[in-house]
């Protein structure tokens, strides 16, 4: 992918791979660029609303909710392993169904097929990889907002990609103006989501006129 081209060309062999903490950030950053582009390309409020709705459902829901539930499943599995228990497919299915049921309550009916979703992607369970999706999305949101609000935003994002693994996640995030030693990037992300919802509501009102 693109970030590895930048880092390969800018770093030594030993520093080309960026931290797992934010390795998914470039892909979700591109998703934000796409939804922004579509919103501003369309003239019809319905199409604009469509673009922003997919930002919420495809980018944020998938990375903040779906992977959160997979991480919760993973944590329970690890706890059982540390307790000396042996796990088979049936046990893993029951754990996943339990996690989904506790999260959704009576709002969503969880069937036996949903319990199989833990086996979708094996790399989700490589070194707590599930957590990188939400962490990376906070980073990509910070980069996107920096791009929109700073004349140097594009340059800084490219420098972020070029940094590869030469810096710590804390240092790399600072290239795009994000201090992840605080909760501000997360709070900014939450505010951005709120603003997106408000804009969707405005487009809906336009359609009702």
Where does each model-flagged region fall?
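C-terminal, non-catalytic "cap/extension" segments appended to globular domains
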Residues: 3-5, 29, 40, 67, ...
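Post-HExxH zinc-binding segment in Zn-dependent metallohydrolases
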Residues: 6, 17-46, 56-57, 62, ...
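Solvent-exposed, amphipathic alpha-helical "stalk/arm" or coiled-coil-like segments used as scaffolds
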Residues: 54, 58-70, 74
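Short beta-alpha connecting loops at secondary-structure transitions
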Residues: 10-18, 53-58, 78-80, 120-121
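Short, solvent-exposed segments of well-ordered alpha helices
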Residues: 14-21, 60, 64, 123-130
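Catalytic Zn2+-binding segment of zinc metalloproteases
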Residues: 1-13
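Short, glycine/acidic-rich hinge or "gate" loops at secondary-structure transitions
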Residues: 10-16, 39-52, 150-157
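An alpha-helix initiation/capping motif
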Residues: 21-24, 51-55, 89-94
